[in-house]
Amino acid sequence: MKKIFTALLAAGCLVACTSKKTAYEQYTELYDNVVAQLETVEDRAAKDSIIDNFVTEGYTLLLENVQDVTSDSIVLNIFYMLSPEQKAELFAAIPAERLQMPVLEPVYKEYQIELKTSAGNPYIDITSLKADGSALSLSELVGKTEYVLVDFWASWCGPCRRLMPVLKELYESYHPSGKLEILGVSCDRDEAAWLKAVEEDELPWLHIRDQRAEPYNPCDQYGISAIPTTVLINRDGVIVARNPNEAEIEEILNK
């Protein structure tokens, strides 16, 4: 009887162990549920709330299963939605040898570049082409006004386009007095789409477009993993904020 009971326990364990879902399978279920929810909602605020909850739940799942190698695929899916604090916690938890593997190495390198271009660091000079084909460098602007705001965006990016009225208001308020310059850095592949968006949104500041090849690759140089991304640089060439909101920008400019 004891042998039979032991055999049943072993069989039960085998079924339980083999039926346990991997971290990525659990994440896929979570993702599918969120997609289904989004299809039933029209309100933008409600959609944003669903996505925020998804990121929170996905990140929690990721941390709980960080030793599961299938979680590497979750990192690739969710990395671009994480906060700087979450990224720091995540990469500290992942075994160092996995960060050097082909799956995670690219996003880990992006994260390291983000760290180098976070608040408190000296800015990295970038150069790319304007609409007329001439080159413009960030170093030509830094020091000419109190602050330079670099805005990484694209014509196809809804949140980027919705940010433009805010930036226009800041520009109109602070540019005439020499407080603020803005440099738009487009991540568009399509030059015509970029130029059309600049014209449609009536953006009065300077613009360049990432050419996706050195030396005209500013998005790579600043580790841009999601847009819009803004970087605020002071007269001394020090980054004072990365992705500040409108209130934070105004607080800095009004000091």
Predicted regions and their residues:
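Thiol/disulfide oxidoreductase modules built on the thioredoxin-like
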Residues: 201-203, 210-254
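Sec-dependent signal peptide recognition
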Residues: 2-7
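Hydrophobic beta-strand anchors of alpha/beta hydrolase catalytic cores
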Residues: 149-150, 182
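Conserved redox-active cysteine motifs that mediate thiol-disulfide chemistry
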Residues: 152-169
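C-terminal motif of bacterial Sec signal peptides marking the signal peptidase cleavage site
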Residues: 15-16
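N-proximal helix/coil linker or "cap" segments that precede and/or mark the start of modular domains
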Residues: 84-130, 136-145, 172, 192-199, ...
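Conserved segment of the thioredoxin-like fold in thiol-based oxidoreductases
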Residues: 172-215, 224-227
